[in-house]
């Protein structure tokens, strides 16, 4: 005898069907989350605030990559280069023109959109590994241009950027940055959620499945691909601008290839094709190295292995990626969905917690 499963379609209005928050339970949990996020900066110390700000910064780029790879199915290995586009656009405008924040941020976004248009063109002819290699070229080209600028201007330690001012308030402490980055991250998620429900977002999902079928349905595949690259690159470049201001300097050495790998891991570990997966993957990628270092401190191994901490973090990071690819290809969001299904079916069935 099989366990009964939840069934039925309980929405009776179109407004209910298109609502972002569809149930009372979701409203309650979102309210709790909003209260927790609002109260966090008043309870956290400077270290926790810095970690939270890093999570918010990375989440913008992770959502952008999820739109491109997770929904549109276009592989990109140039994410660190896109961050560098936004950061160097900000640094050059500040250094050469003393441009304020309200100019450098949109300028960085426009620069990212132009780069996305140019480097999205190969996606019209290339797929898979070949497309990945073409986007990897973006990384090295941008970093080379950044290094040339630093060399010609004699900036051996990078471009130093003063803290920006927003509505008359200088962003000099972690709490002020937390508010700005939380607003930016929330806006990115809401924009992405609504974009995925438009004609453009549905075309991305279609070309991810099978391009020939999408084209037969009347979808202009080249336009869909280019729009995915442009939107993703715009958001990522804007995140690079915010990262440059938050760190207070811009340098080509701050964007190694490992940053791209971290963002790809965010998508894989979080779960392909889910914005929630991008956010869960961001938490994992940012907090996992901290957990490794805390474990080493607890075991008293920090002094002995101090010179190997970075290598240990990278090795543990690689092992985690392999384990997720082999044993949990749906990522953290897959685990979360099975937990939800378990509570939905309880006490009649607990099968969803096992392997599907």
For the regions a language model picked out, list residue spans one by one.
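Transmembrane alpha-helices and adjacent helix-loop boundaries
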Residues: 2-356
């Amino acid at each position: 005898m099989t366990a009964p499963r939840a069934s039925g379609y309980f929405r009776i209005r179109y407004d209910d069907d298109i609502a972002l928050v569809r149930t009372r339970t979701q409203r309650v949990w979102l309210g709790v989350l909003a209260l927790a996020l609002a109260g966090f900066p008043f309870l956290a110390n400077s270290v926790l605030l810095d970690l939270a700000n890093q999570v918010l910064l990375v989440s913008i780029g992770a959502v952008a990559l999820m739109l491109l790879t997770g929904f549109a199915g276009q592989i990109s290995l140039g994410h660190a280069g896109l961050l560098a586009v936004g950061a160097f656009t900000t640094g050059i405008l500040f250094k050469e023109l003393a441009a304020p924040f309200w100019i450098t941020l949109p300028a960085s976004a426009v620069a990212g959109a132009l780069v996305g248009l140019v480097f999205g063109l190969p996606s019209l002819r290339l797929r898979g590994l070949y497309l990945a290699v073409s986007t990897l070229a973006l990384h090295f080209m941008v970093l080379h241009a950044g290094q040339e600028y630093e060399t010609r201007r004699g900036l051996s330690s990078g471009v130093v950027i003063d803290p920006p001012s927003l509505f008359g308030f200088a962003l000099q402490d972690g709490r002020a940055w937390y508010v700005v980055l939380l607003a930016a991250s929330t806006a990115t998620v809401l924009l992405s959620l609504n974009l995925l429900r438009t004609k453009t977002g549905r075309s991305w999902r279609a070309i991810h499945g099978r391009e020939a079928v999408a084209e037969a349905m009347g979808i202009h595949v080249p336009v869909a691909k280019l729009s995915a690259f442009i939107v993703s690159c715009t958001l990522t470049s804007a995140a690079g601008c915010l990262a440059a201001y938050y760190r207070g300097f811009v340098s080509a050495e701050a964007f190694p290839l490992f940053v791209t790998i971290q963002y790809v891991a965010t998508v894989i570990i979080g779960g392909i094709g889910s914005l929630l997966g991008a956010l869960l993957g961001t938490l994992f990628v940012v907090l996992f190295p901290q957990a490794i270092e805390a474990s080493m401190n607890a075991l008293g191994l920090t002094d002995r292995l101090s010179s190997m901490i970075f290598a240990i973090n990278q090795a543990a990071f690689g092992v985690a990626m392999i384990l997720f690819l082999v044993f949990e290809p749906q990522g953290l969001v897959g685990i979360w969905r099975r937990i939800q299904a378990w509570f939905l079916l309880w006490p009649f069935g607990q099968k969803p917690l096992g392997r599907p």
